[in-house]
Design a protein with these regions (language model features):
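Catalytic toxin/effector domains delivered as secreted proteins or via bacterial secretion systems
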Residues: 2-147
Length: 147
């Protein structure tokens, strides 16, 4: 169906633009006293701009406060194109992952999880992680953490 193909192409373009903006934010991180400062990586959910907690976002990963579970799931869908489909990871928690199959972010896996090895330090309840991001994006690990 031509309409479905067109709508899918628009969705993919929107996703790619959103991910490209996020990538620009990660690339713009500056070193402050030896650490990457991620306090300027803002997120857009609908008409709402979410800013990271500036004092907590000094280790290279932005940490956001006061973001609802629904908003986190909406962000995951915005980045991946799919609603979370969780599977239980024994002794850890829940995890949902999607791999992008087209466009400049092809091969990038987006993971939503409610566990983290840094939970004690960050207080994060949810993490959106990006693996195998395009080579143009600086950094080994790209994560968004939510308290």
């Amino acid at each position: 169906n031509i309409r479905e193909t067109f709508n899918q192409a628009l969705d993919n373009l929107s996703r790619d633009n959103t991910l490209n903006e996020l990538g620009k934010g990660f690339n713009a991180r500056q070193r402050v006293r030896g650490n990457l400062d991620a306090s300027n990586i803002n997120l857009q959910i609908g008409f709402k701009t979410i800013r990271p907690n500036s004092s907590a976002s000094k280790n290279g990963m932005p940490i956001y406060s006061n973001v609802s579970r629904r908003e986190i799931f909406d962000l995951y869908e915005k980045y991946s194109g799919q609603r979370p489909d969780f599977r239980n990871i024994p002794n850890k928690g829940q995890l949902s992952s999607t791999t992008i199959t087209s466009g400049p972010w092809k091969g990038t896996t987006i993971i939503l999880r409610n566990f983290s090895t840094s939970r004690e330090q960050t207080g994060a309840k949810w993490t959106i992680e990006f693996r195998n991001q395009p080579a143009s994006i600086r950094g080994q690990r790209l994560e968004l953490k939510f308290r």
